[in-house]
A protein has these predicted regions:
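The feature captures the beta-strand-to-loop junction immediately N-terminal to the Walker
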Residues: 33-35
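Helix-to-loop junction immediately C-terminal to a conserved catalytic motif
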Residues: 48
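ABC ATPase C-loop
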Residues: 147-148
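Conserved catalytic motifs of ABC-family nucleotide-binding domains
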Residues: 151
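Helical segment within the ABC ATPase nucleotide-binding domain
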Residues: 170-183
């Protein structure tokens, strides 16, 4: 389980994250919703150690990781798919996926795990194509596949539907549901697309101005008025 307690972050004179506390449990999809500029991506960067937290603690599977560097968090079983995907455009699809195996020994990192191609068949069909030649939706699938290649216990996704065609959004949603159903991974999904989040969420969190202003179970999102809270 991911446990975040009283997390604060500042940027210049601005108080970006204001005492955030929440949990993301193994076997559940925790959806974090909020409008642009409320601090969602800053929170994820703190969780991955890209930006150090100024105050508060982050624990993963009972152990404090607040002081861990990003690569240490990867080795602890945490994977992050950022906005913009950050794939390697000049590398092939297969080479991009092999990059996700960097936390394993050379012997274990020789081949792309078969389960990646089972989740995303298009990646196997295009494994010799350069990443930069893929469509936006295919690049997003590649970015998620690369993250999953590290066999994480916590998968963090930052707005995976942004700029993606509806058919691929459905495919990504189906993959997230499959991963959650296995029950051995916590998934933290940051999303602005309400319907996508509502379909997947076991737990929801709503951020506004650096604070979590509402939280609850996914099945009560509509009754709790979450759609109105995140409407742009």
């Amino acid at each position: 389980m991911l446990n975040v307690e009283n997390l604060h972050q500042y940027y210049g004179g601005s108080h970006i994250l204001r005492g955030l506390s929440f949990e993301a449990k193994i076997g559940e999809v925790t959806c974090l919703l909020g409008r642009n500029g409320v601090g969602k991506t800053t929170l994820l960067k703190c969780l991955m150690g890209v930006i150090p937290a100024k105050e508060g603690t982050v624990k993963w599977e009972g152990k404090p990781i607040t002081g861990f560097k990003p690569h240490q968090r990867v080795h602890a079983g945490i994977a992050y798919v950022p906005q913009g995907r950050e794939i390697f455009g000049r590398l092939t699809v297969e080479e991009n996926l092999l990059m996700g195996l960097s936390r394993f020994s050379a012997k274990e990192a020789r081949e792309v795990p078969e389960f990646i191609y089972e989740l995303f068949p298009v990646l196997e069909q295009m494994k010799h194509r350069r990443g930069g030649d893929l469509s936006g939706g295919q690049q997003q699938q590649l970015a998620i596949g690369r993250a999953l290649a590290s066999r994480p216990r916590l998968l963090i996704l930052d707005e995976p539907t942004e700029g993606i065609q509806p058919s691929v959004i459905k495919e990504i949603g189906a993959v997230i549901q499959k991963l959650a159903a296995k029950g051995d991974m916590a998934i933290l999904l940051v999303e602005q697309f309400y319907d996508f989040a509502a379909e997947l969420a076991d737990q929801y969190l709503v951020m506004s101005r650096g604070e979590i202003v509402q939280q609850g179970r996914g099945e009560t999102m509509e009754a709790d008025g979450v759609r109105g809270l995140v409407a742009i």
